[in-house]
Amino acid sequence: MSMFLGLLFLFPLFFILFKNLLPPRKKLPPGPTGLPLIGNLHQLGRLLHSSLHKLSLEHGPVMLVRWGVVPMAVFSSNEAAKEVLKTHDLETCNRPKLVANGLFTHGYKDIGFTQYGEEWREMKKFVGLELFSPKKHKSFRYIREEEGDLLVKKISNYAQTQTLVDLRKSLFSYTASIIFREAFGQNFRECDYINMDKLEELVQETETNVCSLAFTDFFPRGLGWLVDRISGQHSRMNIAFSKLTTFFEDVIDELLKTKQLDDHSDLVTAMLDVINRPRKFGSLKITYDHLIAMMSDVVLAGVNAGTVTMIWTMTELTRHPRVMKKLQEEIRATLGPNKERITEEDLEKVEYLNLVIKESFRLHPPAPLLLPRETMSDIEIQGYHIPKNAHVKINTYAIGRDPKRWTNPEEFNPERFLNTSINYKGQHYELLPFGAGRRNCPGMTLGITILELGLLNILYYFDWSLPSGMTIKDIDMEEDGALNIAKKVPLQLVPTLP
């Protein structure tokens, strides 16, 4: 009996000792309670960035949600984003292998969705040299200015009769024309097989499918694979991406009729030249799959994102007449009256336009969650343990609305950027429209130039007003989209000559 009592007395001591010998339990970020198998999927709505923002207000700027059975770390403050994208950039610069991304990129042969490694580095170097280098950017300046002239000419026809302009269609055509001429060597006005409306539909369908989830992505692999086949999800993705591939094959066939491959006048001819004369670029052997994947990347990232930002900017300017008036007065006073043509030299002269664009990026980042990252090792962010192979989301939408960082964050006020060094090039983590670190957007310079030039043209040459009977309060601000979050209801305005 006494031995039993002694053991009973010693047991708590042994338990405490044993517990102290165990490694300490790592502190995971807080997050909403999930359900078995599906995790938190039932709490995530159609607009993922908005759903995650609402959850972060309850659970904090570092949050863990379950994407089915997959852990997803969500970061909603500039401090946390800096730790991820700067301090732990190398450990978080991988991309998760998602079914849609693999199909879209022909087996991860691009630079946007490909996993981090030697092939990605070599491909990024090649594309940087053949499309995004300062030399190439300068050589393509005439294309951008010509398309700016054409945009003004088209809108002038509407202005003469004061007819409504669907800015989405006008600005999509302007952006797509530049991208196709620079990257693919194709001028829409010389191509009978390219229909702008059908191209816009194709881009939208592709973007929707790139961001759609396969059950394989978040269910146990065998179960997810089976559900994808039974539900037809895998088949739907294949059909959508095959349409894009067929379109690019037509572009390539047309280009081969008219271009010399060895002049490397655009990305497609440069890649075809390397493919047709087998050799390696560094350690990378470029294939036809690389070409189609890169064309897909350029269209997805280059065409829609710029259009979306111009539309949101014009929407906010229309909703805020004070800002519109101040901006147009500055533009016209700086550039002078009766200017025949806007050039890229003019972009550096209009300081307030730069502030307006920053504010538009803050409130309406085109891709509010950026592209997903994946941790390659266990890391610690803001004192929380983030496990290896967790998906990583940077919610730039939430960061732009953080009241701890911004005064009156829901207010459109470009003056907030006066006398600050904050820019959108990836060094300031409160404003990240192009991301930061190793996986930032390589086409940032081109994207910004297209955006600034388009806005400068339509704001210098035209005054803009709402349709008769419509007021500022009637402007619908509902969002829509998958990767690039656009204005759901088209922005239609009446242009007039000043």
Curated annotation (Swiss-Prot):
It comes from the Eukaryota. CDD domains: CYP71-like. Its cofactor is heme. Its EC number is 1.14.-.-. It is an enzyme of class 1 (oxidoreductase). The keyword Secreted does not apply. GO terms for cellular component: endoplasmic reticulum; membrane. Keywords: Heme, Iron, Membrane, Metal-binding, Monooxygenase, Oxidoreductase, Transmembrane, Transmembrane helix. The chain crosses the membrane at residues 3-23. Pfam families: p450. Belongs to the cytochrome P450 family. PANTHER family: CYTOCHROME P450 71B11-RELATED, CYTOCHROME P450 71B31-RELATED. This is Cytochrome P450 71B31. The gene is CYP71B31.
